[in-house]
């Protein structure tokens, strides 16, 4: 039996991507294999000794946690929900734990929405049978400050394509057409019908999003390559949601 390390568990509304606006329970896992310069979840970068549970009441639970224990914690969030968002950090770093947790949640009737940085295909392979949605956050060098990992992205997308999949690109003022074309061609190799979401970066730590005109240009540049492109900013910071 493996154990997991969780940053927090809470009930809120999905603030980005294709399912923006739906009610979800969120499980934010600790640790990440990347170090993006404009990361907006710094609290999830390292393992922690306890995690918060925020629903109708606010309580704390000790780490590490068993799959059965975490499923029980989720059952305390009694709000109606569309799905459970498995997020991070990078949740696939705890793939063996997810392989124990997700079957339990599926037996309880939950729909599983996985948010991943799309760099750990072997870990996704372990759990794909229990996932319903994959939000693949393909990282651009202009936004992260790190080289893109397109080969890992390609392999993961081929696995994820058997489920409901979309690709998210966080874009900044400096994002180039060449980056967008490369990312678009990567997605088209898997399927031209995979939706691609352009998400303007949250102004944080010096990050600047593209202006409205440039976002339209970016959408057109991607639209030459794949069938469905959407510009969707994060809504939870605007509305004060978690």
PLM feature segments, named:
Residues 1-66, 76-78, 241-242:
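N-terminal [4Fe-4S]-dependent radical SAM core
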Residues 62-69, 148, 152:
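Short secondary-structure boundary/capping elements
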Residues 73:
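Conserved alpha-helix/loop element of class I SAM-dependent methyltransferases that forms part
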Residues 80-83, 92-230, 234-242:
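Conserved AdoMet/S-adenosylmethionine-binding subsite of the radical SAM
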